[in-house]
């Protein structure tokens, strides 16, 4: 039997794709009576994403604090964007490697479902940038719903049925 979904985590990088995932999560939370947990993983905007979290500490403290406060305000605005929506919600900011922090947060808070955006990168872009969503799907203990921005092409032949020959080869 499936456990009830009472806590939904929505990680956000403040992209349009993450905002679409949040809208899905708000609808789910309303239908299920679940609480929303909006999470942003802070990283130094001047350091490449592949760097270790220790590099993030190199950002001058005043600039780092300003960036965190701006992120906190963005989270608050997204959570309270529509006063007619009736759901419980919290938001938080953590620092570190994005996918790892999302999974750890979900474990620590007893999250039942993660709803997150995915950019759907393929090929070289995927190899160079990796996929936070893919890592979360592979390592999270709870189910993960990935959401693409509307109009995103998923595959050049997505509207055609896939035959077993294509899957097997």
Question: Where in the sequence are the language-model features?
Answer:
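Small/aliphatic-rich secondary-structure junction motif
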Residues: 2-58, 150-152, 161-169
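A short acidic, glycine-rich active-site loop
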Residues: 57-73
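Rossmann-fold cofactor-recognition segment
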Residues: 89-91
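Charged docking surfaces used in two-component/phosphorelay signaling
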Residues: 93-101
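Glycine-rich phosphate-binding loop signature in dinucleotide/nucleotide-binding domains
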Residues: 105-111
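Glycine-rich, Arg-bearing micro-motifs that act as flexible, cationic patches
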Residues: 113-135, 153-156
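Short, structured coil segments at secondary-structure junctions
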Residues: 132, 140-141
């Amino acid at each position: 039997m499936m456990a009830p979904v009472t806590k939904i985590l929505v990680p956000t990088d403040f992209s349009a794709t993450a905002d679409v995932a949040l809208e899905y999560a708000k609808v789910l939370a309303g239908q299920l009576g679940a609480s929303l947990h909006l999470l942003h993983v802070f990283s130094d905007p001047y350091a490449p994403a592949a760097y270790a979290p220790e590099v993030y500490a190199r950002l001058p403290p005043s600039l780092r604090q300003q960036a965190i406060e701006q992120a906190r305000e963005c989270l608050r605005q997204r959570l309270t964007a529509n006063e007619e929506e009736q759901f419980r919600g919290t938001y938080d900011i953590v620092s570190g490697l994005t996918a790892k922090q999302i999974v750890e947060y979900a474990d620590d808070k007893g999250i039942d479902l993660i709803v997150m955006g995915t950019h759907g990168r393929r090929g070289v872009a995927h190899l160079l940038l990796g996929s936070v969503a893919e890592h979360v799907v592979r390592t999270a203990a709870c189910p993960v719903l990935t959401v693409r921005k509307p109009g995103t092409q998923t595959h050049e032949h997505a509207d055609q049925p896939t035959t077993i020959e294509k899957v097997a080869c």
